[in-house]
Amino acid sequence: MIKNNLLLFLLVFFAGCGFSSPNIVIILADDLGWNDVSYHGSEIETPNIDKLISSGVELDRFYVQPTCSPTRAELMTGKSALRLGITRPISKNQRLGLGLEEKILPEYLKELNYSNYLLGKWHLGSYTPEYFPTRRGFDYFYGYLSGGIGYWDHVHGGGHDWQRNEVGLREDGYATQLIKNDTLRIINEHDFTYPIFLNINFGAPHIPNEAPEESVLKYSYIQDETRRLHAAMVHEMDNAIGEIFVALEDKNELENTIVVFASDNGGLTPDVKLNPSFLAIPKIIGICNTENRFGISLFQWVCENYSGGSSNKPLPEGKMSVSEGGIRVPAAIWWPGKLEYSKSQNFISMMDVLPTILDLINYENQLNVDGESRVNSLSDVTNPETSKYVVTNIINDKYAVIDMPYKLITSNEGDQLFNILNDQSESTNIAEENQAIVSELKNILSQWQFGENKSLPISEVLKDPDLFGGEEDRIPWVEKAFKNSETNLTPNNGGDLKWVLLFGIVIILFISVWIYRK
């Protein structure tokens, strides 16, 4: 009843004011930690994100997958990443991306005459052009296809990765600012007779830790250098969000715009636990403290992933983990005059965003999705809707099942059950005395839909790691995709297998020295 009344009100409102369908802006941060925003008490100042939170619906129990591609797949489809077979980041040499048979958000919006723009990160497949966003409902794409680039050089894994509409683009500038500038241009030039969908996927604050000097100096009071750089990257993103809001206001469109903000997963913290565990060896034996790391890209990749400057406190762990710090993220939905400020403790996951948005704009066709519309939760934050959600870690050896207020983490190490409403730090395992609940949650897991896993084996990824920034040793990725479509789909390898073998030798030597010292 509440939902029907809200939708009726919105329809009458638009009819009376002569407005078109509302604009939609989805802003995704990349690896933004729970304690990386000032409204959670962080030392990092985020006034524009805070303003969005304080005047919209703060989604305090917003859950995602613990890595980027799985979360982005859920956003685009409304389906579980496990059902889609996307359970870890899509590697640059991975032939399969988000299934081409899947209908994604811009394709739904096309039916309602939206103009669809994607700016920033895609990361849902790029091995051949058929996976490009411009082949999947987006009218325009400016940014990069892979999981991360150098902020200044726009390089990923040895290849340049920056384009506009399937054409490689070489331009100077800091990636966050370039994404912002192009977004402002689009807003200023758009004919708002037709509604616009802006999917703005910032790379910040994903590694590498790079930021303009003036932003770094702003945080000179932060002693730790990595944290200081991380803060500057968040600052750049927050400034960009503020300017985008001003541009919409200048066009008199801010009141007619739905904004969704979230991070794709928890922050990458300095104490991250890489899997497989042997990847910790370069850090243990001090390679990560050397300048050149012997010129080995595998060592560089490992050490980069130990250079995270995020904080998820008081939530445990972070990116790649199924603990709260990896999957519970800052988030809000904002629509002035229609959604009043509130702090919602109701559960919502990334796969609920698509059906919720389509419900808000009165999309009437049948949906084949796993997520649910949360319009009731947005209009009545005291309405305790329930939902079941399953996540997995980066090597798929640990699963978490959420059915509020309980969360079960199951692995070969045993079962852990937490009441996450009362124990967000996950410090008290209550599995032993609640075996009936454990059984119920295991039953949810057993009935969950799992699709064929599209991920490359970890061993294949390590042969040619996905580095972020650095020297170019191959053709740009957009060019490689077109070549792949014409040839035998050979990987764009930089010939790093010899270094994998050397890495194995180092492991053997390390173990030998350890045994000798014992």
Per-range role (PLM):
Residues 462-464:
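Polyampholytic, low-complexity intrinsically disordered segments
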Residues 17-411, 415, 424-443, 450, ...:
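Formylglycine-dependent sulfatase
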